[in-house]
């Protein structure tokens, strides 16, 4: 079993403020036209989507819920949640990715509202307005991930859920997510990940506590290259997901 460290992030955000990296935006905007090609650089994301969707739905129950998907990219997770009956808004700061997301929504007939806005700006504008916030494969690509977590906590109503996923920071994660996925297996373009931006579970838990979020569940993810199937795991050494609930007032 190997880790799904080859998964491309949804988006890193657009350089409209201090919590964005222009290089990250340029890097992933260049891949925007490949979002919905299951055999492109985004194949791992397509393969992973059923697992993370089922995990999120199992905890939060998406049907009828108002959801914001931060760093939605081309809308793979956003559309999947909408298909389960959620009222989804996908936000991103990559103009190209959002154009792809809008077009695919029209083609598929799955209604998703997309908006080009920073998480912090939306949180300031609409605090406590949604039931669920997702921020998947994105936090390791911004300068200040704690600011994004705080925005997630501000956006969600008391008692609502916040879901995040990212990559742990240790030798195993470096070998698998950077050396293995980018240089040996060449599953991702070189330079996709910056090891220094990886986030340990303890750091993520601290961000959440500071934002008034309680941990509900943490799970790792593993990948079987033969079956091309992702599975939940207790191993959080590389890729992991965390579910939080905003403390009720």
Curated annotation (Swiss-Prot):
Q: In which pathway does it act?
A: Cofactor biosynthesis; ubiquinone biosynthesis
- Write the Enzyme Commission number(s) for this entry: 2.1.1.222, 2.1.1.64
Q: What class of enzyme is it?
A: transferase
The keyword Zinc-finger is assigned to this record: no
Q: Which residues cross the membrane?
A: none
One of this protein's GO BP terms?
A: methylation
Function text: O-methyltransferase that catalyzes the 2 O-methylation steps in the ubiquinone biosynthetic pathway.
Top-level taxon in the UniProt lineage: Bacteria
Under the heading InterPro entries, the entry gives: SAM-dependent_MTases_sf, UbiG_MeTrfase
Q: What lineage does UniProt assign to this protein's organism?
A: Bacteria, Pseudomonadati, Pseudomonadota, Betaproteobacteria, Burkholderiales
Q: Which family does it belong to?
A: Belongs to the methyltransferase superfamily. UbiG/COQ3 family.
The residues that the entry says bind S-adenosyl-L-methionine are: 52, 71, 92, 136
From the Swiss-Prot or TrEMBL record, give the protein name.
Ubiquinone biosynthesis O-methyltransferase
Could you list the residue ranges forming a coiled coil in this record? none
Organism for this UniProt entry: Cupriavidus pinatubonensis (strain JMP 134 / LMG 1197)
What Pfam families would the database entry show? Methyltransf_23
Catalytic activity annotation: a 3-demethylubiquinol + S-adenosyl-L-methionine = a ubiquinol + S-adenosyl-L-homocysteine + H(+); a 3-(all-trans-polyprenyl)benzene-1,2-diol + S-adenosyl-L-methionine = a 2-methoxy-6-(all-trans-polyprenyl)phenol + S-adenosyl-L-homocysteine + H(+)
Q: What keywords tag this UniProt record?
A: Methyltransferase, S-adenosyl-L-methionine, Transferase, Ubiquinone biosynthesis
